[in-house]
Structure formats: structure tokens, C-alpha cells
Amino acid sequence: MNSIIEFPLLDRTTQNSVISTTSSDLSNWSRLSSLWPLLYGTSCCFIEFASLIGSRFDFDRYGLVPRSSPRQADLILTAGTVTMKMAPSLVRLYEQMPEPKYVIAMGACTITGGMFSTDSYSTVRGVDKLIPVDVYLPGCPPKPEAVIDAITKLRKKISREIYEDRIRSQQENRCFTTSHKFRVGRSTHTGNYNQGLLYQSPSTSEIPTETFFEYKSSVSSHELVN
């Protein structure tokens, strides 16, 4: 696993051995080694965090200190299926995090909805429809080594970014905020995809009401059951 991180340039020295750098580089250098994550787990992918806390992978050596309050976190790791009822809560947690903040989407269910999105009308098909995602971590579930690799990639991204550009990009590409209201739109998934071309609309809709009830009254209940 390649864990080499390009740290910001802090080695520009003068004749008096004074280090000179930019405020953006200094901020990135301090943040990439002290990420405080908020763990948002809803299903089996979240169990992999138990392995990360152990001595084998040593979650703390990257400066990661799990927090229970979004106001103290700058990274949120989403793991598991997100339903429509949970969507406002997830967005609210993200909105309460201070800037700059980052998101790691962990597992197939978080990224695409997974197997639960096949026939379910209440599953969010990708957490990036709610909040902006910085690192995608596929798997079902991802191994602890993959989680460490995702954190390493996020640290590389932080070391190269400019804070002003990130804020501007988030404002222009905003996904959803709690101040907005849900709008009832056209359904993109009806659940009838398995029927395909064999699906036919009920023929009774074309029969006049009077004709239908006259036929129903002339046929016994036993014949209707058969």
C-alpha cells in the first residue's frame, strides 16, 4: 500500500533559518494529521470499524479521534444503507459540521444503494445525492486495509487543496441543504422492471362502468373465484 503523502512545502528557509510558507499550506498540514471523524453507520459495513480500532491496524496512528458530536468533527464516514426517512438526519449532521469538512462513502449500499435499492422505493441510491462525497470506498464490506487506503487518499487530497477554492466549489455544486424543502417529483423507479415488455395495463379500465357491473352481477361468486 502506497502511503506516501505529499506534505505542503514548509522547507523554504531564509538566511536566518526561518521557515516561510503560506497560510493555506500550513492549514492543510495541520488538518491532514488531525482528522476527527463522525462515524455514521447503519448496517454491516460499520462492523469493520471494530477491526480498525484494534492494535493490528491502529486507527489512532493517523490522528483520527472519533467524535460523537458533528460540531467537533471535520470528517464523516457513512457506512450502510441510507433510507428516505434517514436522509434529513444525515444532511442535518453534515450541515452542523464546521468547515472545512469531508465525506467518505464506505460500501456499496452507501455509494449506490446496493442490493436494497433493487425493489425498494425508500432507499437512497447513493449518498452523493444528499451530501458531496470526497472519497468513494467500494466493497461489501470493504476490508480494513481499504479503509486505511481511503483515509490516506483523503489526506493526499487535503495536502493539495486550497480552502477558498473548496468553499467556492461547494457553493456552486450544492446537493441539498436542510433549508430546502423536499419536492415531490416524478418517480424514476416504479418497481415493475422485472415485468418488462410483458406488463400490460388492466383491461377493465377500458370497459364502461355499467357493462362491468352488469357482468359482475350476472356471474356467481363461485365462478369469479375459479
UniProtKB/Swiss-Prot annotation:
Key words, A-Z: 4Fe-4S, Chloroplast, Iron, Iron-sulfur, Membrane, Metal-binding, NAD, NADP, Plastid, Plastoquinone, Quinone, Thylakoid, Translocase, Transport
Cofactor comment text: Binds 1 [4Fe-4S] cluster.
Record: residues binding [4Fe-4S] cluster: C44, C45, C109, C140
Cofactors, names only: [4Fe-4S] cluster
Matches recorded under Gene3D superfamilies: 3.40.50.12280
SUPFAM superfamilies assigned: HydA/Nqo6-like (SSF56770)
UniProt KW Ubl conjugation keyword: no
Localization terms from the record: Plastid, Chloroplast thylakoid membrane
EC number: 7.1.1.-
One Gene Ontology molecular-function label: 4 iron, 4 sulfur cluster binding
Top-level EC class: translocase
Catalyses which reaction(s): a plastoquinone + NADH + (n+1) H(+)(in) = a plastoquinol + NAD(+) + n H(+)(out); a plastoquinone + NADPH + (n+1) H(+)(in) = a plastoquinol + NADP(+) + n H(+)(out)
InterPro entries: NADH_UbQ_OxRdtase-like_20kDa, NADH_UQ_OxRdtase_20Kd_su
Any GO BP: aerobic respiration
Major place of residence: plastid
One matching Pfam family: Oxidored_q6
Topology relative to the membrane: Peripheral membrane protein
Cellular component GO terms held in the UniProt record: chloroplast thylakoid membrane; respiratory chain complex I
PANTHER family: NADH DEHYDROGENASE, NADH DEHYDROGENASE [UBIQUINONE] IRON-SULFUR PROTEIN 7, MITOCHONDRIAL
Subunit-level organization: NDH is composed of at least 16 different subunits, 5 of which are encoded in the nucleus.
Family in the record: Belongs to the complex I 20 kDa subunit family.
Entry function: NDH shuttles electrons from NAD(P)H:plastoquinone, via FMN and iron-sulfur (Fe-S) centers, to quinones in the photosynthetic chain and possibly in a chloroplast respiratory chain. The immediate electron acceptor for the enzyme in this species is believed to be plastoquinone. Couples the redox reaction to proton translocation, and thus conserves the redox energy in a proton gradient.
Protein's recorded name: NAD(P)H-quinone oxidoreductase subunit K, chloroplastic
Organism encoding this protein: Morus indica (Mulberry)
